[in-house]
Amino acid sequence: MKNWMLSLFLVLTTGLTLSAQSTVTGKITHDGLQRTYRFYIPLNLKAGQKLPLVFNLHGLGSNGIQQEFYGDFRKIADTAGFFIVHPDGTKHPSLGQNYWNVGVEPSGVDDLGFLEALLDTLSFQYPIDLSKVFCTGMSNGGFMSYFMACNSDRFAAIASVTGSMTTPMLQNCGRSTPIPVMEIHGTADEVVPYDGSSGVESIDEVLKFWTQLNKTPTNPQVIKVLDTNVNDNCTAEHYIYPAYGSSASVEHFKIIGGGHTWPGAIINIGVTNQDISASKEIWRFFSQTKKTTAIHQTTGLQNLAVQYSADASQVTIVPENSESRFVVSCHDLQGREYFSRQLNGQSTLDLFELLPGNYYLQIRSANQFKIFRFFKQ
């Protein structure tokens, strides 16, 4: 996968100039590691307008910039109005390739925490609608999207392209509330087989799991997608498990004869379906979804107080409940993390080592958080 993604990158970037006004590269430090990302700002962003955010995660051996071009949402974002972030994974300890840790690797890299911290950083810097944050990805990025659905409440919906769920992920999925899910997968995928492999669930089992959790009808509506491109050597079927009441929808595009590829991609790397655009279908799916309550509302932290000394060299955190447990982290406006500590009850922290400048404290308790900005003299 690494070699063909490198070839794709060279083809796509030849003679290409990125607009500095549209794409921002950034770094944050999480769990002692410096992490990088690319953030796409759509055209015609209006002052005061809050926009949705799509996390677009690369596959094994790839990176954020390659995924930005291969699984491309940028023209859609310009028209529909949403932000896109393309984060970078870390090097796999044995393979030496970029990857996402979906809970089965011994490296201990906290990718779930990184993506949540990245969301916190971006939402502090940009006008993001936190009720419309979505996660999608290719291959290993699709696995990571499922991992986020199982272990985070920050996303309104997820979509996987050529990804699946590991058996431990499915068996230990911590989610109890419905979340809209889309899976796009080729039946001739030799990297992540449609019928599963050792330690990886089949797509049928993945769909069964989410339709049960989401409380959708067990019999889907099946639509044969019009074969508009007879030269792509594959066809598509669209399976729809609709939502009713408090349930959440599940959709699946089954690419008959399709390979380990992103449908609609401008470069064919293996058998690539051109009857649909995965990016357009994913955004259609995401755009009809909104969390009923804003993510990470401050319920439970409303009465938490933060008191600074005159020169902001110390800060005292006073929760409503003296037995409250929470995590406090300090960041600068570029997202660099200076410390992260777990505290119980009223606590005072020294900020002497911080250089003069603007910072913010993020305080987490269970699944809620608050952010406080301050200036260190």
Range-by-range predicted roles:
Residues 18-53, 79, 83, 136-159, ...:
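A domain-start/cap signature at the N-terminus of enzymes
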Residues 24, 28-38, 44-134, 147, ...:
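Serine-hydrolase catalytic machinery in alpha/beta-hydrolase-like enzymes
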Residues 24-33, 337-354, 367-368:
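Glycine-centered tight-turn motifs at strand-turn-strand junctions
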Residues 183-185, 189:
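Short beta-strand/loop motif that positions the catalytic acidic residue
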